[in-house]
Amino acid sequence: MAKKDYYEVLGLQKGATEKDIKRAYKRLAAKYHPDKNQGSKDSEEKFKQITEAYEILTDDQKRAAYDQYGHAAFEQGSSNGGFNGFGGGFGGFEDIFSEMFGGGFGGGSRRQHVVRGQDLRYDIEISLEEAVKGCKKDIRLSTLAECDNCHGTGAEAGTKVENCPHCHGAGRIRRQQGFFVTEAVCPSCHGTGKKIEKPCHSCHGDGRVQKAKNLSVTIPAGVDTGNQLRLSGEGEAGENGAPAGDLYVVIHVREHNIFTRDGANLYCEVPISFSMAALGGEIEVPTLDGKLKLKIPTETQTGKLFRVRGKGVVSPRGGYAGDLICKVVVETPVQLNEEQKELLRQLEISLDGKANHRPQQAGFLDSVKNFFTHLGK
């Protein structure tokens, strides 16, 4: 029996666009799918014709050959036009296809279409102390897990799971058309290689259901915002027994009311009094391990930085510890009584005109004076 024109099979004209071909295929495949027409040989044959037409017409090279030579382009022994030299068999081409598909045209290693589970993301917020020292956190998330009722088979308990009659359990369909070989996911079983007699009532044949899962996550010392922890196999369950995906825990460190962080170093501002800045002394500064004493030299200016070695963050990679960097801020006294104000006035009078007591101010005034001098020239 002569093969029907591929365009006619899909109800299209020869100049149909790829979009038209895909639309027609989806409509007809849904209509004649074997699952909807069980036992109907006519529907099964029609479905095969539709699938074959779709595979040829959606491949640019095959479609061009078909438009020029018709079905003869895909017949063994054809010597039409551009296919001269391939008549009488495939010779070395069969070896090439064997390497590509793992065997000869009719066999080879066939594998089911397995889909690894999706990776999941979980965002977690921790304190700076937890980030620096490490901690354990219990988390709860919702994910697709193996169905307890069917144990991932997708079939109702007590019912059969048979090999798909269309791909014979391979999950993929391979066709030889002339010197072309095509391999695609079986449209009947969608790559599972199985035919489920009665789908599981819990998972509706998917083999997976949505479940809540509790996990304990160990967060190592030294992590920072944006770091990710990968928990292998804790993502969604895979399809048809495929491996589960992974879970990525994304770290977010809360802002601290005292410290800021830059890499392995911690920073803080330490207020000191006007008199201590001038006379020097000793103050207590906070660290994540407790308090420590810091010596303030005489004549300390606001903004001066003091580095405390090893009191920062331990790097999770190198093992070295960063530093704590304290920035001194000299506080201006407020809410002074008259006696205190008078003492400050006396101090101001005693310092007036003596540049060595105000080196920064003197330097600034000299710079301003020079600026206006040059501006007037």
Curated annotation (Swiss-Prot):
Pfam families: DnaJ, DnaJ_C, DnaJ_CXXCXGXG. Its cofactor is Zn(2+). GO terms for biological process: chaperone cofactor-dependent protein refolding; DNA replication; protein refolding; response to heat. Residues 5-70 form the J domain. Zn(2+) 1 binds at residues 147, 150, 200, 203. GO terms for cellular component: cytoplasm. It comes from the Bacteria. Its main location: cytoplasm. The keyword Repeat applies. A zinc finger (CR-type) spans 134-212. Binds 2 Zn(2+) ions per monomer. GO terms for molecular function: ATP binding; heat shock protein binding; unfolded protein binding; zinc ion binding. CXXCXGXG motif repeats lie at residues 147-154, 164-171, 186-193, 200-207. InterPro entries: DnaJ, DnaJ_C, DnaJ_domain, DnaJ_domain_CS, HSP40/DnaJ_pept-bd, HSP_DnaJ_Cys-rich_dom, HSP_DnaJ_Cys-rich_dom_sf, J_dom_sf. Keywords: Chaperone, Cytoplasm, DNA replication, Metal-binding, Repeat, Stress response, Zinc, Zinc-finger. Belongs to the DnaJ family. Participates actively in the response to hyperosmotic and heat shock by preventing the aggregation of stress-denatured proteins and by disaggregating proteins, also in an autonomous, DnaK-independent fashion. Unfolded proteins bind initially to DnaJ; upon interaction with the DnaJ-bound protein, DnaK hydrolyzes its bound ATP, resulting in the formation of a stable complex. GrpE releases ADP from DnaK; ATP binding to DnaK triggers the release of the substrate protein, thus completing the reaction cycle. This is Chaperone protein DnaJ. It comes from Haemophilus ducreyi (strain 35000HP / ATCC 700724).
